[in-house]
């Protein structure tokens, strides 16, 4: 993918796709090529992800900056529905959470977390049986996460 100018895809005994890496490594193309019916190909990671677990979220994950990825995959593997937030839509955690989480509370990139999104996250978190707080860095823009973390710690 990184060094090829063109890619030829063969399925069975015939050529089914030919094009640039950008054309080939698209979610729909990979799904059709490999017959992925219940799961996702994520072109950002170049990985195939299993489908999200259905149901009301049992766990709320406070994450960001890639800290949630291993937790999301573990919860999905253990068949536990989960919610996560508050994630910026340009955060690497968001890219996977959108595929695996039953609910993702988001914020616009580089914006301060709004009260509306903070309250939504609090409501979803309150309905969950368990909360996992990652060591997501907190700065000026995502300072609202401090309130969410404090509320989670009070539940312990």
What are these regions (language model features)?
Residues 8, 12-23:
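Conserved switch/coupling elements of ABC/ABC-like ATPase nucleotide-binding domains
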Residues 21-22, 27-34, 144-156:
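P-loop/Walker A phosphate-binding loop and immediately adjacent motor/lid segment at beta-alpha junctions
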Residues 119-124:
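Short amphipathic alpha-helix with an adjacent loop that forms part of the alpha/beta core around
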Residues 5, 128-130:
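Conserved acidic residues
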Residues 35-116, 133-134, 139-142, 154-156:
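ABC ATPase nucleotide-binding domains
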Residues 2-9, 29:
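Conserved catalytic segment of ABC-fold P-loop ATPases
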Residues 1, 125-126:
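A short, aliphatic-rich alpha-helical micro-motif
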């Amino acid at each position: 993918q990184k060094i090829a100018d063109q890619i030829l895809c063969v399925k069975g005994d015939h050529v089914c796709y030919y094009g640039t890496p950008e054309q080939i490594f698209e979610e729909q193309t990979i799904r059709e090529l490999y017959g992925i019916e219940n799961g996702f190909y994520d072109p950002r990671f170049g990985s195939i992800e299993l489908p999200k677990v259905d149901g009301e979220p049992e766990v709320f994950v406070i994450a960001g900056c890639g800290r949630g990825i291993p937790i999301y995959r573990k919860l999905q593997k253990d068949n536990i529905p989960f919610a996560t937030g508050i994630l910026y839509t340009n955060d690497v955690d968001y890219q996977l959470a959108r595929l695996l989480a039953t609910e993702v509370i988001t914020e616009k990139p580089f914006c301060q977390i709004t009260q509306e999104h903070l309250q939504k996250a609090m409501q979803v978190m309150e309905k969950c049986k368990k909360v996992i707080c990652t060591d997501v860095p907190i700065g000026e823009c995502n300072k609202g996460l401090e309130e969410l973390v404090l509320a989670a710690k009070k539940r312990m």
